[in-house]
Amino acid sequence: MVAEDAAGIGTNKIGALAALGYDYAELLLCGLAKLPEEAFWQVQNELTQSGLRCEACNGFFPTDFRLTGPDIKKDQIREYIARALDRAGALGVERVVFGSGPAKSVPSGFPVSEGWKQVAEMLHDAGEIARQYQILIAIEPLRRQESNFINTYQEGCRLAKDVAHPNVKSLVDFYHLVEEQ
């Protein structure tokens, strides 16, 4: 689906997807999270009227967010996660994909091991919030052209194991898997 709406969410395609017989829509969570309340409820109404569910969301974090490095803002991250997952919960989302390449990339000169700890802690906190909505967070390893961090399925599995939260797992995207071989 190519998003043509102002927020880049793809809501302009909901009616067409329903008419074509699609089972569900996968929307951009960072776009949903930044919508004003009224615009968000319009998205929910469009989904309801179309009969289409939003079972999954991609784009957990916006590209300008920093999840690793010396200047992360933990309070801002927690507030964002709470808002984003609240929105996902209101739509009945079951899975949120954490690829978020630019947001998770480790800044040059910053220890990767420290970035790993930061992301693991953040995902554990996110898992606690996700549990309230019965949402599963799926770690998506991305090819190196999109991020310098969590690039292989093995790394995604290791991160999920380190997070040790039942609402945080790893997924494999065939495209990224093949690109990293």
Q: Where do the language-model regions lie?
A:
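Active-site-proximal loop/turn and secondary-structure-junction residues that shape catalytic pockets
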Residues: V2-A3, L29-G31, F60-T63, P102-K104, ...
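Secondary-structure boundary/capping motif
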Residues: I9, L35, P107, S147-N148, ...
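Residues at alpha-helix caps and immediate loop-helix transition turns in enzyme cores, especially N-
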Residues: I9, A39, P111, F149-E155
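Active-site groove signature of glycoside hydrolases
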Residues: A90-G109, Y133-R143
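Glycine-rich tight-turn/loop motif centered on a GG-T
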Residues: T68-I72, P107-W116
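N-terminal pre-domain/capping segments
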Residues: M1-V93, H124, K161, H165
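Acidic/histidine-rich catalytic cores of soluble enzymes
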Residues: Y24-A25, C57, A120-Q181
